[in-house]
From Swiss-Prot:
It comes from Homo sapiens (Human). It is found in: Cytoplasm, Cytoskeleton, Cilium basal body; Cell projection, Cilium; Cytoplasm, Cytoskeleton, Microtubule organizing center, Centrosome, Centriole. Its main location: cytoplasm. Residues 7-39 form the LisH domain. The gene is ARMC9. Changing G492R: In JBTS30; uncertain significance. It is linked to Joubert syndrome 30: A form of Joubert syndrome, a disorder presenting with cerebellar ataxia, oculomotor apraxia, hypotonia, neonatal breathing abnormalities and psychomotor delay. Neuroradiologically, it is characterized by cerebellar vermian hypoplasia/aplasia, thickened and reoriented superior cerebellar peduncles, and an abnormally large interpeduncular fossa, giving the appearance of a molar tooth on transaxial slices (molar tooth sign). Additional variable features include retinal dystrophy, renal disease, liver fibrosis, and polydactyly. JBTS30 inheritance is autosomal recessive. This is LisH domain-containing protein ARMC9.
Length: 818
């Protein structure tokens, strides 16, 4: 009852409004009289006389501007009071607007006394021409309007036969009548009583929700049946495996006592381990008494996963796409950006995704090669929050792929726009996250990294990280990872030296943050900047060693090891010769082979299609289908079976997405095929000089190029560089491992520089994003930030912070390096 009383006035007002709209005059009088007698207040509704009078005033103003030929006043009122959904979505409104533009373009020609003012006429014609090139372009394929596209270019339209009807006396009054009818229709629609609107919207909304829920239920039931079958099979296999394991343990105990295992028993055990389809045939066709037969058959029973024959996606009409991205409504732009991103993120890794990306690049989808003032890239500064966010998501998706980064890097304005958006965006957290993610991946390319340092991005990052509790997990992790990447460069360290106290305080505070995913990046940044003498002095003055030792007491073994080497760096004196030479040359900027598509790219979608509205791939293939021009592009592949050991150090800046997926996404590098073949066979060998030259240039000779990029750069003899400062003498995968010379000893504390380098090897030739960090080193003459590749395709990454410590303890094929 309390709720009714609270809203009684509004409810009674809705009833009164509806009775008035439906012309129940007697009922309305009785209703109003009874409300007055009972003392019930009647709320004045939006649909009252005030709204009617306002609507009439607007109509009169529009008609007056039409009669006077006042183009600016008319279209200002038109855009202010006619909703964009009607202007852009209603075909009659679009056609009427086209003819209205013609009316104002020829107004002076029709109604001027004497010769019209040339300057004013040129201005009106120019306005019409601009309309034809922008919003009016949507009607260019309509036969009815096609002749009028030549109107701005005809010297004297009054005598031209194509435009004869425009200058007839009846044309303007007929157009005016259409305008008045349209305005009356719009006014009536806007005067629909609120009670009726609520009823319609509620019923339609419930119907749509019910339909969606039903579809979801059917899909969920289908999946649950599939999963139940898989679960039952896995459970049966598990019980069978436990039973066989128990018997094998008993048999092993029996052999210790001297009892022999019979061939028949061995055969029965092996058959039980195979799938049902193979059991009967194997029982009679395979001799398990031969040594090695049983184990070989068991391994062979694990059938290799057959690669699906994934079809290429249909080609698109990119000219039409780009035109609508620039000139379409904000809602259409958002749906197109979403569909283009989905095509990239949901495509199958491999040929399908590569073909999609190559089509985008070859058609210059983002206008990176264009110098036009109006380009797709400008959507990053759209007034629409949704368009701005979806543009940032698409750029982040491009930046997640090596070829995409190369494409974006062609236009220097892209980096400037992203940096500007990062610093200005304060409304939309997801937009800011995607811009930050793209910039973090941009730091894989050295020229872009240099530009970011010069633009003062380090100062912005440090300022943001002063209050990490206000940041999302994604923003925190990518900010720290980007800061670490920039701190690996000499110029980056020099920037940090300008605000050494603040940088050290921020990093020391982050050491104790609850998000453990950021620890490797914080440690890497600390170790790197402490190679600068002035920063070491500042750190000693603020008692950094005591702060670090507090974390030694609380941290795990891996964290303790990292901090111990940071302390050794803190207490070290001048570094050996060669360490201080600049690493800021731009001569090596190759592409890396692994690409990561994060799950975050498609999270929390802002727009959903209404009933009958197209979206995603259906929108692209229905409205923008092009000529079939897709061709597969052979792509370099990473090294198979190369992983990182928990005993290996963080060797290069890496990608947060790749870090969690179990393989490094590292700095941009290419690999010759010969090295890849040897690496796959598990025999690291010395890299031939010819191959090394090709590798340095990043020019693979075959599509199957794959290798641990740790072989790419050879450190100078006797040179010691801390992780974050140097190149690892990477054992090249084409020969026997190199034998390192004895590392020089650090004069400050008696620790060999080789030992220090073993904990931090991080100077990248081209830094990468922070997803594959590890800190325990191989013993080598001079450790380096060396990328390691896996041949597995990109996988969905979890949100930063959701898998704490997933970066640690990864098995490695590098543990044999000595």
């Amino acid at each position: 009852m309390g709720d009714i009383l609270a809203h009684e006035s509004e409810l009674l007002g809705l009833v009164k409004e509806y009775l008035d709209f439906a012309e129940f005059e007697d009922t309305l009088k009785t209703f109003s009289k009874e409300c007055k007698i009972k003392g019930k207040p009647l709320c004045k509704t939006v649909g009252g006389s005030f709204r009617d009078s306002k609507s009439l005033t607007i109509q009169k103003d529009l008609v007056a501007a039409f009669d006077n030929g006042d183009q600016k006043v008319f279209f200002d009122l038109w855009e202010e009071h006619i909703s964009s959904s009607i202007r852009d979505g209603d075909s009659f409104a679009q056609k009427l607007e086209f003819y209205l533009h013609i009316h104002f373009a020829i107004y002076l020609l029709k109604y001027s006394v004497g010769r019209p003012d040339k300057e004013e006429l040129d201005e009106k014609i120019s306005y019409f021409k601009t309309y034809l090139e922008t919003k009016g372009a949507a009607l260019s394929q309509t036969t009815e309007f096609l002749p009028f596209y030549a109107l701005p270019f005809v010297p004297n339209p009054m005598v031209h036969p194509s435009f004869k009807e425009l200058f007839q006396d009846s044309w303007t009054p007929e157009l005016k009548l259409k305008l008045i009818k349209f305005l009356a229709l719009i006014s009536k629609a806007s005067n629909t009583p609120k009670l009726l609107t609520i009823y319609k919207e509620n019923g339609q909304s419930n119907k749509e929700i019910l339909q969606q829920l039903h579809q979801q239920l059917v899909e969920a039931e289908r999946r649950s049946v599939t999963y139940l079958k898989r679960y039952n099979k896995i459970q049966a296999d598990y019980h069978n495996l436990i039973g066989v394991t128990a018997e094998l343990v008993d048999s092993l105990e029996a052999t210790v006592s001297g009892k022999m295992i019979t061939p028949e028993y061995l055969q029965s055990v092996c058959v039980r381990l195979f799938s049902n389809q193979m059991r009967q045939s194997l029982a009679h066709s395979v001799d398990f008494t031969r040594p090695g037969t049983a184990s070989t058959m068991l391994r062979a029973s694990l059938a290799p996963v057959k690669l699906k024959d994934v079809p290429l996606l249909p080609s698109l009409d990119y000219e039409k796409l780009k035109k609508d991205l620039i000139l379409g409504s904000d809602r259409l732009k958002a749906f197109l950006l979403q569909a283009l991103r989905w095509r990239l993120t949901t495509s199958h890794p491999g040929e399908q995704r590569e073909t999609v990306l190559q089509a985008y690049i070859s058609n210059d989808l983002l206008d990176c090669y264009s110098h036009n003032q109006r380009s797709v890239l400008q959507l990053l500064h759209s007034t629409s929050d949704v368009v701005r966010q979806y543009m940032a998501r698409l750029i982040n998706a491009f930046a997640s792929l090596a070829e995409g980064r190369l494409y974006l890097a062609q236009n220097t304005k892209v980096l400037q726009m992203l940096e500007g958006r990062l610093k200005e965006e304060d409304k939309d957290i997801i937009t800011r996250e995607n811009v930050l993610g793209a910039l973090q991946k941009f730091s894989l390319r050295r020229p872009l990294q240099t530009a970011m340092i010069q633009d003062g991005l380090i100062f912005w990052l440090v300022d943001v990280l002063k209050d990490p509790d206000c940041l999302s997990d994604y923003t925190l992790e990518y900010s720290v990872a980007l800061l670490m990447n920039l701190c690996l460069r000499s110029t980056g360290k020099n920037m940090c030296a300008k605000v050494a106290g603040l940088v050290l305080k921020v990093l020391s505070d982050l050491l104790g943050h609850e998000n453990h995913e950021i620890q490797p990046y914080v440690n890497g940044a600390l170790y790197s900047i402490l190679s600068v003498p002035s920063i070491r002095e500042e750190a000693r003055a603020m008692g950094m060693e005591d702060i670090l030792r507090c974390f030694i007491k609380e941290g795990n073994a891996e964290m303790i090891r990292q901090i111990e080497f940071i302390i050794k760096q803190l207490n070290s004196e001048e570094l050996p010769d060669g360490v201080l030479e600049s690493d800021d040359d731009e001569d090596e900027d190759d592409e890396e082979d692994h690409d990561i598509m994060e799950a975050d790219l498609d999270k929390d979608e802002l727009i959903q299609p209404q009933l009958g509205e197209l979206s995603g791939e259906k929108l692209l293939t229905t409205e923008y289908l092009g000529i079939m021009t897709n061709t597969g592009k052979t792509r370099r592949k990473g090294l198979a079976n190369v992983q990182w050991s928990g005993d290996e150090p963080l060797q290069r800046p890496v990608t947060p997405g790749g870090h969690r997926n179990g393989y490094p996404v590292v700095e941009d590098q290419h690999t010759p095929p010969q090295t890849a073949q040897h690496a796959r066979n598990g025999h690291p060998q010395a890299l031939p000089a010819a191959h090394e030259a090709v590798y340095r240039e990043g020019k693979p000779s075959t599509p199957e190029s794959c290798v641990s990029s740790s072989s790419a750069i050879i450190a100078k003899p006797g040179e010691w560089l801390p992780r974050g400062r140097q190149e690892e003498p990477r054992p090249a995968p084409t020969g026997t491992p190199r034998q390192p010379r004895e590392a020089p000893q650090d004069p400050g504390n008696g620790v060999t520089t080789r030992e220090c380098a073993s904990a931090f090897t991080c100077k990248p030739r081209a830094p990468c994003t922070p997803e594959m960090l590890d800190w325990n080193p191989p013993k080598a003459k001079a450790s380096v930030l060396a990328p390691l590749f896996s041949s597995c395709g990109p996988q969905q990454a979890s949100r930063p912070g959701s898998t704490a410590s997933s970066t640690r303890g990864l098995p490695s094929s590098q543990s044999h390096r000595k």
